Amino acid sequence: QYFPIKTGFMKTTPLKAVDGVSFSIKPGETTTVDLVMRESKDDIQVIGNFNSESTYKPMDSDELKSILATTGRGYYIVAVLGAGQEPTNHALRDIAALGKDFDEWGRGIVLLFPNEEQYKKFRPQEFPGLPATITYGIDVDGSIQKQIAEGMKLSNKTILPMFIIGDTFNRVVFVSQGYTIGLGEQLMKVIHKL
């Protein structure tokens, strides 16, 4: 009797990258089979999930609003920032440097702060060129930060900033946490493959 093993990963397209092998097991013996996981260097891969119905408090409203209601259907960027912290400042400078590219992409970017005090420390004028598609808000109870950390299996749940590119099918195709060199370029590289 033969047994199949199938391995692979889900892509953002209907195609899936799958490998398979069949093997047999003889009574009283141990059978060792190599487990081969395909990896694509070029394709965008689904690396986790994030609920696009998650809510936050927009800075221009007292009502909670979902990421989906803010960005519409399709891909979006969500980040939880630490205002005045160098890793966040560096990330925002990287994004501002490519602000026109993000504006051309035209998708929503939701930048969240852990609380009102953090938002009050934020000085957008220090980052000229930030995309016009940004919506600022508060991660009211820390649920979005927690969801990103858990959904992406981040080893440290408190290091900011946290960035994801996700879609409204709740798939995540990019994650970054903490100090990252060239974050704007990394985001655009993924965006161009979507």
Task: State each model region's role.
Residues G74-Y76, A83-L130, G142-Q147:
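Structural microenvironment flanking redox-active thiols in thiol-disulfide oxidoreductases
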Residues M37-Q45, I159-L194:
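Thiol-/selenol-based redox modules, centered on thioredoxin-like
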Residues Q1-P4, N170:
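A short tyrosine-centered beta-strand micro-motif
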Residues F3-D34:
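Structured interaction patches on ligand/partner-binding surfaces of diverse proteins
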Residues S24-L64, Q186-H192:
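Pro/Ala/Gly-rich low-complexity, hydrophilic intrinsically disordered segments
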Residues P58-D60, T133-S143:
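Short acidic-hydrophobic, aromatic-tinged amphipathic segments that line or gate anion-handling sites
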Residues F50-Y76, R93-A97:
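A short beta-strand-turn-helix
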Residues P131-T135, E150-I164:
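Structural micro-motif
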